[in-house]
């Protein structure tokens, strides 16, 4: 097999699925799949970034999930159609797995248990995200994001600040104001590529 497959994926998939892995490169802006289309592949993001997005009745795009590494389309595994669009926000590479073969492989106990464990971790991540979205003010949402998604008080940005605003459910103008306020209060330091909490213990 001449394509690169991350160790996490090699450890998860049975040999029958590993043999069917296909590498797919994507530029920024490309749609990996479309809302309403019948699922054909499961996607595992190896590099770059993609988001799950759905447009509301008012024409506003909502980011449902941001993926910088891992599976992107778990919710569509057993459905008749994709429930959203998958859009690349940074160019990269994905592993595409035929969805029918993926479904068939779940009949094997070892793989099905590994898949359940992976989904359990994803549920925990979504609960953390829901907790963050439930916070009332933007500063609290931003601090929560850095504390839960960053490392040692530093959140490295994988895209731009406009994408970050969508991730926490606010406008980018409101995000910039919140960052400016936190910087003025000496709580946070902003750089083009990262946000750093200067007083993590005081606000934890």
Label for each model-derived stretch:
Residues 147-204:
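Phosphate-/nucleic-acid-contacting segments
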Residues 1-28, 67-72, 77-79:
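Cyclic nucleotide-binding regulatory module and flanking cytosolic helices
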Residues 31-37:
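Short phosphate-coordinating micro-motif centered on Lys-Gly-acidic
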Residues 40-53, 68-70:
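Glycine- and acidic-residue-biased ligand/ion/polar-headgroup-sensing regions
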Residues 18-19, 37-39:
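Short, small/polar residue-rich loop motifs at catalytic or cofactor-binding pockets
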Residues 63-118:
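Cyclic-nucleotide recognition modules
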Residues 50-62:
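A short beta-strand-loop-beta hairpin characteristic of the jelly-roll/cupin
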Residues 110-172:
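Polybasic "coupling" helices that flank or enter modular domains
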């Amino acid at each position: 097999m001449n394509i690169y497959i991350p160790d996490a994926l090699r450890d998860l998939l049975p040999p029958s699925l590993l043999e069917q892995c296909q590498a797919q490169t994507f530029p920024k802006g490309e749609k990996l799949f479309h809302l309403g289309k019948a699922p054909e592949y499961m996607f595992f993001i190896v590099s770059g970034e993609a988001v799950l997005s759905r447009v509301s009745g008012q024409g506003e795009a909502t980011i449902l999930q941001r993926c910088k590494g891992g599976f992107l389309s778990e919710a569509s595994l057993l459905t008749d159609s994709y429930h959203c669009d998958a859009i690349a926000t940074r160019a990269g590479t994905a592993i595409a797995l035929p969805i029918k073969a993926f479904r068939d492989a779940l009949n094997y106990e070892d793989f099905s248990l590994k898949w359940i464990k992976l989904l359990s971790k994803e549920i925990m991540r979504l609960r953390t995200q829901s907790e963050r979205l439930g916070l009332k003010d933007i500063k609290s949402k931003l601090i929560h994001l850095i504390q839960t998604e960053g490392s040692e008080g530093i959140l490295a940005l994988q895209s731009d600040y406009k994408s970050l605003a969508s991730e926490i459910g606010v406008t980018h103008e409101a995000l910039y104001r919140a960052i400016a306020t936190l910087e003025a209060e000496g709580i946070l330091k902003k750089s083009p590529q990262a946000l750093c909490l200067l007083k993590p213990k005081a606000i934890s």
